[in-house]
């Protein structure tokens, strides 16, 4: 799956599915926070920067890294993801 397709699919998931995926895949704390604030709380780059004490100019790159980490976990470490999270991962991976 291309990075662009992955991003589009993340945006189409329900909030419940996103919450389960973000909290249940074993992301690093910073990645989890970034994705949560952006997708669940709907915060802007400026708000995220303020909340996390980072420069707003670095939020985009940090989010890209967090999405890349999530994609890597889903692609390469799927067997480590808890069983209760896997149905939500399947939703993300379904072709639309």
Question: What is each of the regions a protein language model found here?
Answer:
Residues 2-31:
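Amphipathic alpha-helical segment used for protein-protein interaction
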Residues 3-6, 68-96:
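C-terminal edge and immediately downstream basic/flexible tail or linker adjoining helix-turn-helix-like DNA-binding
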Residues 12-15, 32-33, 64, 68, ...:
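Generic detection of well-ordered alpha-helical segments
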Residues 24-44:
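Short amphipathic alpha helix immediately N-terminal
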Residues 34-35, 47-49, 59:
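Hydrophobic positions on the alpha-helical face of helix-turn-helix-like DNA-binding modules
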Residues 52-77:
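DNA-recognition helix of helix-turn-helix
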């Amino acid at each position: 799956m291309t990075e662009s397709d992955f991003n589009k699919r993340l945006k189409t998931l329900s909030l419940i599915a996103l919450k389960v995926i973000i909290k249940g895949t074993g992301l690093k704390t910073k990645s989890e926070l970034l994705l949560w604030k952006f997708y669940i709380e709907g915060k802007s780059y400026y708000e995220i920067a303020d909340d996390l004490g980072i420069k707003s100019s670095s939020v985009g790159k940090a989010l890209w890294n967090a999405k890349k980490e999530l994609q890597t976990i889903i692609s390469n470490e799927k067997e480590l993801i808890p069983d209760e999270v896997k149905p939500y991962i399947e939703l993300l991976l379904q072709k639309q």
